[in-house]
Amino acid sequence: MSMKYLMLLFAAMIIRSFADSGNAIETTSPEITNATTDIPAIRLCGPEGDGYCLHGDCIHARDIDGMYCRCSHGYTGIRCQHVVLVDYQRSENPNTTTSYIPSPGIMLVLVGIIIITCCLLSVYRFTRRTKLPIQDMVVP
């Protein structure tokens, strides 16, 4: 994993941690100490961000320069360009699990059918190969 992706991952974690909270900035000087109004940690991109994110919202982080994407459900990637496969999507209900692995019983039946088919084919080939041709019987 390159350093660029690690930095992007770290930035995404920061963006998510500040996504729902606005933080007040406090300015101090020797004479004046006051709290300013809340500045949102992230804000949506303006018209310059239209079309930047393929399946999500374009956002600007307060502490980080550049545009980032907040992907819609089922998409991932820097610009939300990758579809998350159905097998790997988390269910909306955390108590349910979805398994796409065939049960051992089905696997055993399939393996058994394959073995029986191979045995029958080998017996058929062996008997066909060893069958002696019928010789004409000559009556004296």
Swiss-Prot record:
One of its GO terms (biological process) is positive regulation of cell population proliferation. The keyword Signal applies. Residues 19-100 are extracellular. Keywords: Disulfide bond, Early protein, EGF-like domain, Glycoprotein, Growth factor, Host membrane, Host-virus interaction, Membrane, Secreted, Signal, Transmembrane, Transmembrane helix. Glycans are attached at residues 34, 95. Gene3D superfamilies: Laminin (2.10.25.10). One of its GO terms (molecular function) is epidermal growth factor receptor binding. Residues 122-140 are cytoplasmic. It comes from the Viruses. Coiled coil: none annotated. Induction: Expressed in the early phase of the viral replicative cycle. The chain crosses the membrane at residues 101-121. The record marks 96-97 as: Cleavage (By host ADAM10 protease). InterPro entries: EGF-like_dom (IPR000742), GF_C11R (IPR011170). SUPFAM superfamilies: EGF/Laminin. Disulfide bonds join 45-58, 53-69, 71-80. Cleaved at the cell surface by host ADAM10, thereby releasing the secreted form of VGF. The keyword Zinc-finger does not apply. Disruption phenotype: Higher doses of VGF- virus than WT virus are required for intracranial lethality in mice and for production of skin lesions in rabbits. No effect in cell culture. GO terms for cellular component: extracellular space; host cell membrane; membrane. Residues 1-18 form the signal peptide. Residues 41-81 form the EGF-like domain. Belongs to the orthopoxvirus OPG019 family. This is Pro-Viral epidermal growth factor. It comes from Vaccinia virus (strain Western Reserve) (VACV).
